[in-house]
């Protein structure tokens, strides 16, 4: 039951663009995890740049830097 939570700066993506990105992400999990399409979910959460550190970096990224599969190229 993989769930992908994409947190990002505002991009003004259309619903069609979100659907395409979600389908692409789901395809990767289906390929590498063997997941079925019905078991996958994808969320898009826009975070304002000035809120990124408080809402994403400090509570989610920073505490897990040692275990992240892909680390960011920035820090605060």
Swiss-Prot record:
One GO location term (cellular component): cytoplasm
Predominant location: cytoplasm
SUPFAM superfamilies: Tautomerase/MIF (SSF55331)
Subunit and interaction comment: Homodimer.
Lineage: Bacteria, Pseudomonadati, Pseudomonadota, Gammaproteobacteria, Enterobacterales
InterPro entries per the UniProt record, alphabetical: 4-OT-like_dom (IPR004370), Tautomerase/MIF_sf (IPR014347), Tautomerase_PptA (IPR017284)
Family: Belongs to the 4-oxalocrotonate tautomerase family. PptA subfamily.
Protein localization: Cytoplasm
E.C. code: 5.3.2.-
EC top class, as a word: isomerase
Gene3D superfamilies linked: Macrophage Migration Inhibitory Factor (3.30.429.10)
Molecular function, one GO term: intramolecular oxidoreductase activity, interconverting keto- and enol-groups
Keywords: Cytoplasm, Isomerase
Active-site residues from the entry: 2 (proton acceptor)
Presence of the UniProt keyword Cytoplasm in the record: yes
Keyword Transport: no
Protein name: Tautomerase PptA
Superkingdom field: Bacteria
Disulfide bond positions: none
